[in-house]
A protein has these predicted regions:
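Pre-Walker A (Motif I) flank of P-loop NTPase domains
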Residues: 46-57, 82-83, 132, 292-293
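Conserved pre-motif I regulatory segment
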Residues: 2-58
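Conserved coupling segment at the C-terminus of the helicase ATP-binding
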Residues: 36-37, 43, 54-60, 151-153, ...
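A short beta-strand-to-loop transition that corresponds to the Sensor-1 phosphate-sensing loop
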Residues: 90, 135-140, 158, 297-301
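ATP-binding Walker
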Residues: 63
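Conserved Walker A/P-loop ATP-binding site and its immediately adjacent core
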Residues: 66-105, 110-114, 140
């Protein structure tokens, strides 16, 4: 008896809006006006600009952007047989999006939060075979050995707040309370280029003074270039220490930026020294670079090029928020007020 080889079905769904009406297990009646408007704008833009790789969608808080991202991902998966993943800043948001996708919208999204060695084989197979979309944290993509190394469509939720998550792959932080030896070695190199007040803070903390968290300063780039050779030698020495390298990740983090210090900034506080590039070099990161489409969902886009700087893109096409979105929202906002600011 011959084996029956399953054939991938060819699904013809005109657009993500039509897909929503086809979701039989959803518990919400219909799309909000601004959600439908954004999906139409997205499709119009894609149809007119087929070679556009980077698109930003302005979807303010409470406008229902999660469903928009899920529908685009599911539509690309079904109609183009693409591997699609929606990336969130935190694990809690991943869990929330997956729960909403399944219980409210009838979309089978897979939860890829946590370390990749804990992903189930069934989930990995379903994702790689384009049978389900994935939802994961930014760190699941931006690491040296990501599971998502061959994704067709990347959708970034809360892209305006993603800078630290994206740049973490190319950031080296040395904390005084974790590795005082390396911290002191670097401080002695940069100390001549710091202010007298900052040097006093350093010595006060060293003499068991109270931790001063009220300042963050930066070594001027010309001075950083002057001490680059000594700085490289000090961090090379720390990264050769097997114990420190394994515990704090010096080796692989340092290898990402060692030859590019001229493009980095060095920030310091009383307890931490951070070296990272101003612009994330994502063009050299293949899991990000070779995606067919990258969609950035942001509460605010602006015109200053900040989104391009965060993601290392030369140009990101923008689709502004539909008019009247604030008259029909689904989210609640939580505001924190610093007591010091109102005293």
């Amino acid at each position: 008896m011959a084996f029956k080889i399953p054939q991938k079905s060819s699904v013809s769904i005109e657009d993500p809006e039509s897909l929503f009406r086809d979701l039989r297990e959803r518990t919400v009646e219909g799309l909000l006006a601004q959600q439908a408007d954004m999906l139409r704008k997205y499709m119009n833009h894609v149809n007119k600009n087929k070679n556009t790789l980077d698109i930003a969608l302005e979807l303010p808080t409470g406008s229902g952007k999660t469903l928009v991202g899920l529908l685009i991902a599911e539509w690309c998966r079904r109609t183009k047989q693409e591997r699609c993943v929606l990336l969130c800043p935190t694990k809690q948001l991943v869990h929330q999006v997956v729960e909403q996708a399944k219980e409210k919208y009838g979309i089978n999204a897979l939860d890829f939060s946590g370390p990749k060695n804990r992903y189930s084989e069934a989930d990995k197979t379903a994702f790689n075979n384009c049978e389900s979309i994935g939802v994961a944290t930014y760190s699941a993509l931006f690491n040296t050995k990501p599971f998502f190394s061959d994704v067709h469509t990347l959708i970034f939720d809360d892209a305006h707040a993603a800078e630290n998550y994206v740049s973490s792959l190319w950031s080296l932080e040395v904390r005084r309370d974790q590795d005082e030896t390396t911290f002191d070695a670097i401080w002695q190199i940069i100390a001549p280029y710091t202010t007298e007040n900052d040097q006093l803070r350093y010595y006060d903390q060293g003499n068991e003074g109270s931790l001063d968290t009220s300042f963050v300063n930066k070594i001027l780039t010309p001075y950083l270039l002057k001490c680059r050779t000594a700085l490289t030698a000090a961090i090379d020495n720390a990264s050769r220490d097997d114990e420190s390298s394994e515990e704090y990740g010096y080796r692989w983090r340092w290898s990402m930026i060692k030859d590019h210090l001229h493009a980095c900034h060095l920030y310091y506080t009383s307890n931490s020294i951070l070296i990272r590039p101003l612009i994330a070099p994502t063009k050299s990161f293949l899991p990000f670079q070779k995606a067919r489409q990258r969609i950035y969902m942001s509460a605010t886009l602006g015109e200053g090029g900040d989104l391009e700087r965060i993601f290392g893109r030369k140009k990101i096409e923008r689709i502004p928020a539909p008019g009247g979105w604030d008259k029909q929202g689904i989210g609640r906002r939580l505001k924190f007020v610093d007591r010091k600011s109102v005293v």
